[in-house]
């Protein structure tokens, strides 16, 4: 990743805690109309994981009988035989989840690594010629498993800071202050140390 190269080159992690990571697996399902409730949200933690393994799930009912279901597992798990994919499959067979998926069909799927360090892992965000935003900056609200709104806000604040200093050929340090004064920073502070 370019971000990791930049963080090392400009020592952007000098004053923050190390980033932690998880793997997120997500599927999109088309389910039976009788199993669908538009707008319904289900979040879980734990099962089928053991008590030493951090993780949880989400299930979001969209319109047109579509459901997004996902499972996130912290990558610091101790069991070398643990398979995030297998844990996700087991999770989908829990009666409280299976009832939504029965008779449905999976339309798409994907997986990705997630930054989960949160507030205490936010690096220095600026360096000569650039700014870290979104996921690269570690902006993720872990309990809500949401980061798109934070990525968008950081991009907007970056644009403002760049616009204000576009004629200067210096590091845009204003951006870090804009982040610290924004609701983004407050939101991450409230869910720190999770």
Positions of PLM-derived features:
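Flexible, glycine/charged-enriched surface loops at secondary-structure junctions
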Residues: 99-110, 168-174
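Active-site-proximal substrate-binding core of FAD-dependent oxidoreductases
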Residues: 138-144, 156, 160-194
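Alpha-helix capping and helix-loop boundary segments enriched in small/acidic/polar residues
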Residues: 16, 79-82, 121-124, 142-150, ...
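Active-site proximal loops enriched in glycine and acidic residues that flank catalytic Cys/His/Asp
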Residues: 71, 134-136, 179
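Short, conserved secondary-structure transition motifs
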Residues: 27, 31-32, 109-113, 177-186
């Amino acid at each position: 990743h370019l971000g990791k190269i930049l963080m090392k080159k400009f020592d952007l992690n000098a004053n923050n805690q190390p980033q932690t990571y998880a793997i997120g697996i997500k599927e999109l399902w088309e389910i039976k109309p009788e199993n669908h409730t538009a707008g319904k949200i289900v979040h879980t933690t734990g099962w089928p994981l053991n008590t030493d393994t951090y993780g949880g799930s989400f299930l979001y009912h969209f319109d047109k009988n579509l459901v997004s279901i996902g499972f996130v597992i912290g990558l610091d798990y101790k069991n070398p035989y643990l398979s995030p994919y297998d844990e996700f499959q087991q999770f989908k067979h829990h009666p409280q989840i299976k009832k939504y998926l029965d008779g449905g069909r999976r339309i798409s799927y994907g997986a990705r690594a997630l930054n989960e360090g949160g507030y205490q892992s936010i690096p220095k965000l600026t360096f000569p010629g650039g700014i870290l935003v979104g996921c690269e900056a570690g902006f993720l609200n872990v309990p809500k498993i949401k980061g798109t709104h934070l990525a968008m806000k950081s991009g907007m604040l970056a644009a403002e800071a760049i616009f204000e200093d576009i004629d200067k050929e210096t590091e845009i340090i204003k951006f870090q202050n804009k982040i610290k004064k924004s609701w983004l920073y407050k939101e991450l502070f409230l869910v720190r140390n999770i």
